[in-house]
Design a protein with these regions (language model features):
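Surface loops and adjacent helix of pleckstrin homology
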Residues: 156, 173, 196
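Beta-strand-rich binding/interaction modules
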Residues: 161-167
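Active-site core of glycosidic bond-cleaving carbohydrate-active enzymes
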Residues: 1-152, 157, 183, 190
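C-terminal beta-strand-rich structural cap/linker in extracellular carbohydrate-active enzymes
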Residues: 182-217
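Short strand-turn-strand beta-turns centered on an Asx-Gly dipeptide
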Residues: 146, 170-173
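Short, solvent-exposed S/T- and G/P-enriched segments that are highly enriched in secreted/extracellular
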Residues: 176-181
Length: 217
């Protein structure tokens, strides 16, 4: 539960000491061996086995409390790592076979993560109106609201290789933040991504671009 500070990621970063120390710790989650310690469970439960089979270090997507974690790079100046890991999870852990669902469906968390992340957005912090930017899976997707408004997400160059966001616009204006608001979707419009095969390490790396944290308010 180290990462479960949804309301104040900036405060969590401060406890680590710096953005760099925070992201190094995040990197380690994906690179440590996928070893299992049953602990008080007394045996290996399915979430542990699913983590081992996924082969993403200690990242256990089948256990919902960590599903927001790949998006936290957007708070620490490395959004391209969010883009990389979100696409890895979407493409490697979900598919249309009997093995294509990486865990159980607690309160709709597993499927809603996929739906939102495949669109290129995710609601990290409950109680805010922000959706953090990830990496869209599709070249074009349209969300039709109840009132008939349409929010279109476009990524014409998108492909398995072109998973990194080079630039983004919202209704024709440069999007220089790692998030959009619910009203942007509800009112309708166009979110357009320029995609590429290499990360743009200059885009949206400042604290200005980071999503909501209580420590920033």
């Amino acid at each position: 539960y180290t990462w479960s500070v949804f309301h104040d990621v900036e405060g969590l970063i401060d406890l680590f000491g710096s953005d760099q120390k925070f992201t190094i710790k995040m990197d380690s989650v994906f690179t440590l061996p996928s070893t299992i310690k049953p602990g008080t469970y007394g045996g290996v439960i399915h979430e542990m086995k699913e983590m081992e089979l996924a082969g993403m270090g200690q990242y256990a997507h089948g256990n919902q409390p960590i599903q927001h974690m790949p998006y936290l790079y957007c708070y620490a100046g490395q959004p391209w790592k969010t883009q990389y890991w979100v696409r890895q999870i979407v493409e490697r852990l979900y598919n249309s076979t009997e093995k294509g669902y990486p865990g159980d469906e607690d309160q709709g968390g597993m499927s809603s993560w996929y739906i939102l992340s495949s669109l290129g957005i995710y609601a990290v912090c409950p109680g805010t109106d922000e959706y953090v930017i990830g990496s869209p899976l599709f070249k074009k997707a349209t969300i039709t609201m109840e009132n008939g408004n349409k929010f279109v997400i476009e990524a014409p160059e998108n492909s398995k290789e072109n998973l990194y966001i080079q630039s983004a616009t919202l209704n024709g204006r440069l999007l220089d933040k790692n998030y959009i608001h619910y009203d942007d979707i509800a009112e309708g419009g166009v979110l357009k991504f320029e995609m590429g095969s290499q990360p743009n390490k200059e885009r949206c790396t400042s604290k200005y671009a980071a999503p909501f944290s209580l420590s920033k308010e």
